Amino acid sequence: MHKGRQNMKNIVLLKGDGIGPEIAAQAVKVLSLLKGFALQEEDFGGCAIDKTGEPLPNGTLQAALGADAVLLAAVGGPKWDACPKRPEAGLLGLRSALKAYANLRPAVIYEDLKRISPLKDEIVSRGVDIMVVRELTGGIYFGKRGRGTEDGAEYAYDTEKYSEKEIERIARMAFDIALKRSKRICSVDKANVLESSRLWRSVVNKVSQDYPEVKLEHMYVDNAAMQLVRDPSQFDVLLTSNMFGDILSDEASMLTGSIGMLPSASLGGKTGLYEPIHGSAPDITGRDMANPIGMVLSLGMMLKYSFNMDRESLLIEKAVRGAIACARTIDISGGCKSVGCDEMGDIIAGNFERLLREDV
């Protein structure tokens, strides 16, 4: 990896707040083993508020818009709770500016970490490897809303609205992802009640005709929530609307035993945004206790989805699997001896370097 050179793949790194700089450093260790990347660090979130008063300074925004990918570590913390502009607002602004309409959230239970999953052994033993594909810019979170008074009582309303175009583009992304996995999609809706879900189902069915090799199943959201706990192995790609995906992706993440393990990608425009799903964890900041795996796997997703570097992405996953076979941060230790964030990063980077040499 080189900094600032021309003709490179340009990555903007947003270390952010809390444990962000600690876990970002581990991802940089891994990225530095690859050639052809230029890394540019920018202020974002609470640290940017401290310097500029804005969670997303214009310089950071312009750098992100001009980059090939954005890698974000963590944002927010209680220090900025009383600020007029919260750090999290910067994340919403960044996603909007990057035109990210799809959120990808994988949830995997690793063989060596089965015992820290809250699920029963007989359920975990079937295997869990799910990709939640959530529509990110439409639906009830962005619909018309308001409050009023009727017959002396206050009321409030929120409106779910989806266009055929919004549904089609997220469906096509989900089907394209399914083609590279086990060719199975479960589309989640509430078509027995909601008109927006009936349109959702209709459009997804139409898109599926262009992907005859992918098996499509529909499931009501209440049943999907139950099935995720009862038998998550039945799912591969879960396609959902914004609100349903918000809920189901968090549910799926808890099956793994630690949110520190999980990456995510927000895609749609030219530039993808990649980040672990956990927060800034101010309670362990500076104590070398953070789990960097979600951050490193976010880097792996970046290589896959922004640069079509499937081989390197797979080797990062293998490096992580090898690391947790012999070392654990405290959140996944399960009573075993734990290592710190920095040491875990060294182990993963060492594994990755070895795998790169062997896989030629």
Residue positions per predicted region:
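Short, Lys/Arg-enriched N-terminal segments with co-localized hydrophobic residues
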Residues: 1-7, 358
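N-terminal beta-loop-helix "entrance" segment that forms/cooperates
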Residues: 37-59, 226-228
